[in-house]
A protein has these predicted regions:
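Conserved catalytic core of the tyrosine transesterase superfamily
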Residues: 1-178
Length: 178
């Protein structure tokens, strides 16, 4: 998992606006790389701040789209105006490839000083962990991530330092005065 500071530093090292936005949406919406790279313009529901995602097994889910990401997506789209793909290759005929985006991610991670071996999937992992740290129910996170099995989501419920500190405070209050 990466901290917010590390993610911001990593994204700041991405030169291509299309690659940067694709990685940002992976983090901001908890998407798999395959879901992000193949996002179509029609997947955006700007009025309701939602994205329609076609996930594993062709299953559809709706995820919240933060307003800052929607604004950035609109600005990016105005630069290429591709009628189909949000993140097109240079020729516009196909979406950006997962392989190329993965290479961009690894290069940016190195440039940002991230020494641990990370893949783009760490953005999705970080999204899920942040939601759980903020008290979002595991079942809600399961739905947002498109996990068929709650056990898959449970992987993200490891105790992070903010969770430990919060837990210590709760337990201290519960046990005080016994």
């Amino acid at each position: 998992m990466l901290s917010d500071v590390q993610i911001r530093a990593l994204l700041a090292c991405v030169k291509s606006p299309i690659h940067k936005m694709c990685l940002a949406i992976m983090y901001g919406c908890g998407l798999r790389i395959s879901e992000a790279t193949t996002l179509e313009v029609g997947a955006i529901d700007g009025a309701n701040l939602q994205l329609r995602i076609i996930g594993k097994g062709n299953k559809q889910r709706i995820v919240p789209l933060p307003q800052p990401l929607l604004d950035d997506l609109r600005s990016l789209w105005r630069t290429h105006r591709n009628p189909r793909w949000l993140f097109p290759k240079r020729d516009g005929a196909k979406p950006v490839s997962m392989h190329v985006l993965g290479s961009t991610f690894r290069s940016a991670a190195r440039s940002a000083g991230i020494t641990s071996r990370v893949t783009p999937h760490v953005l999705r992992h970080s999204y899920a962990t942040r939601l759980l740290e903020q008290g979002v129910d595991t079942r809600v996170v399961q739905i947002l991530l498109g996990h068929a099995n709650i056990a898959t989501t449970a992987i993200y419920t490891h105790l992070t330092e903010p969770t430990r500190v919060s837990l210590r405070g709760i337990l201290d209050r519960l046990m005080s005065g016994l």
